[in-house]
Amino acid sequence: MSATTTASTTTDREATTSNLVAISPFFIVKDLKASIAYYVERMGFELEFQGPPDDVYYAGVKREAACIMLKTITPDVLPQPNHTRHEWARWDAYIYTLDPDPLFSEFKQRGVSFVKELSFIDNGLWGFEVRDADGYVIAFFRLRDGSP
């Protein structure tokens, strides 16, 4: 392979990689309206979309760069948060947070359900964990040195 081909391949790979900007967890929920209300009213998210118009069963809620997708399936398909499968799998989503302190205070005032209040955890992360209306646990943390 020539140097030109290698450089072109690397450039193509870098261009492709730079297209990845975010990931959104997709949570199965029991009651879509109740789940949307929890994220909007308690956690300050905005409803980005829902559909389809004739039979709404999915939605996306967003706050800044964090987006969570919600979907109701059928009455017999219930939410299955990670912690229900094993105690070590306690997070369903991790949101990098530049400054968790004011967010923690806001959530506390809004009546959000906390799994773990603002603190350092053993791997040096500073932040907190919340539980949504369907039992999913979302972690809001930053590294000890202040970086996300």
Model-derived regions: residue spans:
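Vicinal oxygen chelate
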Residues: 2-26, 46-96, 104-131, 142-148
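Conserved active-site tyrosine of GNAT-family acetyltransferases
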Residues: 35-40, 107, 135
